[in-house]
Amino acid sequence: MYRVAIIGESLGAQVAALACAASGFHDIHRLQGSRHPNEQPQVYSLGANASRLLRALVPESIEGLGFQPDRRQVRFAKSAYLLAELPLGEFYQQRYGSPLVNFSAPALTAYLEEEIGNPLKNPMSLSDAETSHQLTVLADSERGIKACDDDPSFLIYHASLPDHPLRKANVLWRGKGQYVEQLADNDQVHFRFITRADIPFDPEQWHDSLQDAFAAKMQVGGVSLNGFTASETLFAGRVAYLHSALAPTSHIRVDADNTALEDAWVLSRMMENYEEDIGDGLAAFERFRRPRHRKVAAQLRDHLLKLTEPSVSKRFSQHVGMALQNRLMPELALAQQDWLYEHDVIKGFR
């Protein structure tokens, strides 16, 4: 097999290294990317579409490091009234074939580094990497995770606390054109705050149990709606781009970049199948993954606009529809997430 360079330090970059090694690539050079160590995420939440890849590559990681929440809840910001709830845990695993798992990002990163056993090397320019390797995989945006749009329409904050009364659930708190994602790993409870740039957070409009999180929150980035247009090009020359290199670097959902893990698996299998026909392999990778990128971009944009809806009447309509659907037609509510979690890139690429 030929020489492969993987640029980046994200989870997608690590999975790319593991997947390429599993596909028979042994001359793999891992290069530091643009992310500063202090800018790495604090938590990963892997749905079945991503956790099944870890189970295939490093099965011990889920049992040893992962925290499996037992339900997903939607609650009102101030009253904490339970608007909707769907089961996770064993029910979710039986439906999709793999669990939804939350990880401490530093712990999972350190564990995978040991499993990879191939230390990161000093940064190299993309052009130099392409010159000295037959295949280059760009896994991180060259702008860095804190890079925002010049005029971001939405701001993103993060906080971590030792505990919370609802730590066993993944909770979406819905406010007035704002929302908070809450999820726990084995050690901490994490909160991701998203708001329109012109609507600052008012802690008094949120539940008492969130006050410590509001006091601890720090801005981690911002995004514009322009960032939710899927790239039509997933490779250039002999450089392949994972989703994490193309999407907004500040994520409006904590699991927004799990698509990069799917890309890493498919790319490794495509290049194994096409052997020395690198150009044909990259073209096949692009054809296979481009529809998924389009779907994810459209869904993320819809997710952001829906949860930051400024109109009171439109939010009320959303709340009524969500409550009725989850209580009277839970199967329909589950079916609406199947597109994300049923997606199994392992099939056909073993």
Give the ranges of each region predicted by the language model.
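Glycine-rich FAD pyrophosphate-binding loop
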Residues: 21-42
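Acidic/histidine metal-binding catalytic segments
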Residues: 64-66, 206-224, 278-284, 296-297
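Conserved N-terminal helical subregion
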Residues: 2-4, 47-166, 198-200, 346-350
